Amino acid sequence: TFSEQGVRWPFPWDMHAKFTRFVSSGNPQSIFFDVMFLDHKEHEKEFAEAIHDSGNVFLDFPFETEEVHVKYSDIDERMEILNQYRFPVDPDDTKMPWVEEAVPPTPMLARAAEGIGYANIKPDVTDKVNRQLPLIIKYRGFYYPSIDLVIVMHYYGITQDDVEIQIGKYVKLKNIPPEKMAKPSSDRTITIPIDDEGFMDINFIGGPGSFQSYSYYYFAREGKYKHKSLENKICLVAAYSSTGISTDIHPSPYGQLFGIEHHANALNTILNQDFIIKLTPLQNVLIMLVLALLMGILLPRFSIVFSVIFAVVLGLLYVIGSYILFDTMNFICAFTTPIIQIGGTFSFILAYRVLTEQQEKKYIRQTFSKFVSKSVVDELLKDPKMLQLGGQKKILTVLFSDIRSFTSLSETMPPEELVEHLNEY
């Protein structure tokens, strides 16, 4: 429809102004533009007025990981506005920042907005999959909040004084109205777990299209939005298309997702208090120790075939148990290492059993072949427990053979020759 009118991405700012006015008439809780408004453009004043009149528009910006070659003449003014949102650094935080430079929105738009925050996403360095979101970023001796945290603070109606940050542990939101909490508590706080770089784990609810989306074109009009579908909702606006206009796409545990979907999942995680709880390294080590002890005690008592079955079943039970813990309680256990440990422990015990059984059979063969026939030795090798002292009651047929003149014969032969002679019988 836009293409029919000759409108191409990025859309002109007067269209964003029209969109903002129309959506605001539907009384949404927040409007978040995941669109970078970094350069001054035509209709900036009109767009700023629409943002200001709405009173609930949030804009994002990038924290660059390298030095920015494009210099903005008003960067000091931009940073002055951005600094209104910063938090003091935790005294125990000694880590170096991983960002180089901030590029906030234009001052006119930033002042008109209800809040601004960065929109950075940083995939895992090992497999390039994004499972986390930097809730706070350390920059020039302060913590700066992500756009998601800024929106959440607005949703709960709290200020910077109601936020407590302890790096490597949590971001705590305090004095929250109970009626706005998904899981109300007496202390009226929400504790968001973070790592030592300020990253929170995103509890993704699914793959592409998990959140309801609408065409921008429908809302970019004059007039009033008369339906209730936007009322008290957080509306996220971004280039969200399979036609190639959006390059903001990142891998997730559920496949490729647009950047705005990562933010939607992060907001959903916080607002529903569905935080992922990772077991500590010590807890994971204890789990692996229990698995190793269980296998060490039971496997030597089983046959090799039953040992294989037991190891496979134990591995499957661990996988199923880990899934149930995550699905019901949001607990994440170490996954790959315990499975490898089960296989490694089984292989070690199996190798040990094979070696010891071979040594035992070799000892039995060498010892008893001097005294009994080969067939008797073979029977002993089938079941070495037959060597133990004690009687057994069995119905047997016995053949007695008497060697004539054995006494006089034995007196004339050395022991070695006598045994060899007896073995012929």
What function would you assign to each model-found segment?
Residues 258, 262-266, 289, 375, ...:
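Generic alpha-helical secondary structure signal
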Residues 103, 371, 400:
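Short aromatic/basic micro-patch
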Residues 269-371, 375:
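Transmembrane alpha-helices and their extracellular/periplasmic helix-loop junctions
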Residues 388-425:
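Catalytic NTP-binding/metal-coordinating core of nucleotidyl cyclase/transferase enzymes
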Residues 370-389:
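Cytosolic juxtamembrane regulatory segments of multi-pass membrane proteins
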Residues 165-166, 170-225:
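Substrate-access "cap/lid" subdomains that shape
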Residues 1-189, 227-306:
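Non-transmembrane functional regions of envelope-associated proteins
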